[in-house]
């Protein structure tokens, strides 16, 4: 499976903060926002990743993440020149996807929870169709909504309905089979001229190929599209990290945990950052622990 991060939005709701730089590069507490969705794909075991940016911020993303080799992964980049909706990502990425399954995550979505890596692994066990994730919200009219029957089988999807049929939002993480580009090409742009991700999911639903997994108690989903939600996310990350003494979405830690890279390789790649910040002190502590104990890293 390959992965796509859609990070092309202008972030106008955050102006003036996002005028000089993409909102996806703004910090959520101690790390850039892009680290959080990238960590989700890495936790799912995905190593080939495409980041779709806007034209202005393309170079900034490359400067931050490079080709991904420092994490033992492969990162490519493409530009979305015109905002044509979330599903447009699959048309932009068609030559990257080829005949593979693909995961798409929105650049401003943060996920956290005990056992999240195992949860993602279970979701990847579906060998056909699409898998999306439902999360209970108090304001469903703001989101794409999935309705279930009495057996919790998805029966309908609606985009920001005035009268929601459920309180379960479809979050910004989607897994698709190799037919996703074909199905995307069949979509008609919405009234706002965009290829809607809800319409794509409806194609899979109509074919009885849509799987919905619920992010239940113990999992947190944060959509950081506003100033208040960014502050909420930063406070959440700060609190969890302070209480547990562990980083959230530390890419180097996940790379070690998934064995994408060895401690020695990572130490060499991070030499210029040694002693520069608390974040890198944390990474070096992990490296030293692994080298001294010769044990595999356990991600808690």
Predicted regions and their residues:
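Conserved donor-nucleotide/metal-binding helix-loop-beta segment in metal-dependent transferases, i.e.
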Residues: 113-141
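Charged/polar low-complexity intrinsically disordered segments, enriched in acidic residues
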Residues: 255-257
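A secondary-structure boundary/capping signal
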Residues: 106-107, 133, 176-177
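Conserved N-terminal catalytic core of the sugar/cofactor nucleotidyltransferase
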Residues: 2-5, 13-16, 26-27, 31-106, ...
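Catalytic-core segments of class I nucleotidyltransferases/pyrophosphorylases
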Residues: 103, 121-124, 153-253, 264-265, ...
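A structural signal for short hydrophobic beta-strand segments in well-ordered beta-sheet cores
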Residues: 25, 146-148
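Active-site glycine-centered loops adjacent to acidic/histidine catalytic or metal-binding residues
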Residues: 9, 108, 136
